């Protein structure tokens, strides 16, 4: 069965952090985790397998920052990074039932206009490039993770919906007042994400915000 067939019918568990696990294996401060898909593929796969062996159903590809802005000026392409990451993830899932690889998309690192200088259309294009690569290389779903900018959430979701037919999950980050960085409250943020067609919505890394204040809406 595919991921969408199980969503909402069974409890499915995501893995945990990838970056801190790679740090424990030797990733140095300032080193790009995504480059380990080429230089330390066995270590990246071992992280995925550890989570799967302990009950996770969904592993996140090592692509949190795999956007063209991050690799500007480097002799490497987004497609190469995404392809290598998904190859590792799919190898970790091989032979397992109910094991899926999510293409993991994090923030670009820039605020979108009008709060910052990244145009909305460019953000859509940046995410679209990653989504197309993920779909081409066999991702089971798209995870848009740890988002706090309303405009960037819209850009990433539109890119996902326009460039693939995979299930899309969005996780949001709220501050201690239950607000996104750009000011939307929980209800408004959830309504927006739901309206844009996300298959599931979650909350991560909120500070002092009681679980029931987000959980009631997600």
Model-identified regions with their sequence ranges:
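Alpha-helix-loop-beta-strand connector modules within alpha/beta enzyme cores
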Residues: 74-96, 154-170, 216
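Conserved, mostly hydrophobic/aromatic
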Residues: 16, 51, 89, 142, ...
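Conserved small/polar residues in nucleotide/adenosyl-binding loops
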Residues: 207-214
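Glycine-rich anion/phosphate-binding loops
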Residues: 36-50, 74-88, 121-128
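Catalytic domains of carbohydrate-active enzymes, especially glycoside hydrolases
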Residues: 46-59, 137
């Amino acid at each position: 069965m595919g991921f969408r067939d199980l969503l909402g019918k069974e409890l499915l568990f995501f893995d945990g952090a990838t970056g801190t696990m790679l740090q424990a294996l030797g990733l140095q401060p300032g080193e790009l985790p995504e480059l380990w898909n080429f230089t330390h593929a066995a270590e990246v796969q071992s992280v995925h397998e550890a989570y799967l062996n302990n009950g996770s159903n969904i592993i996140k590809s090592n692509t949190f920052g795999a956007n063209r802005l991050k690799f500007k000026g480097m002799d490497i392409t987004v497609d190469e990074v995404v392809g290598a990451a998904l190859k590792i993830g799919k190898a970790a899932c091989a032979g397992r039932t109910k094991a899926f690889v999510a293409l993991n998309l994090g923030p670009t690192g820039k605020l979108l206009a009008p709060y910052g200088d990244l145009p909305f259309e460019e953000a859509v294009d940046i995410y679209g490039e990653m989504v197309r690569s993920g779909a081409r290389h066999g991702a089971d779903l798209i995870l848009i993770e740890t988002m706090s900018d309303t405009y960037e959430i819209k850009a990433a979701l539109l890119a996902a919906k326009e460039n693939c037919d995979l299930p899309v999950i969005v996780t949001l980050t709220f501050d201690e007042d239950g607000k996104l960085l750009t000011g939307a409250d929980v209800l408004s943020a959830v309504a927006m994400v739901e309206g844009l067609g996300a298959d599931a919505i979650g909350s991560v890394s909120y500070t002092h915000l009681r679980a029931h204040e987000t959980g009631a809406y997600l």
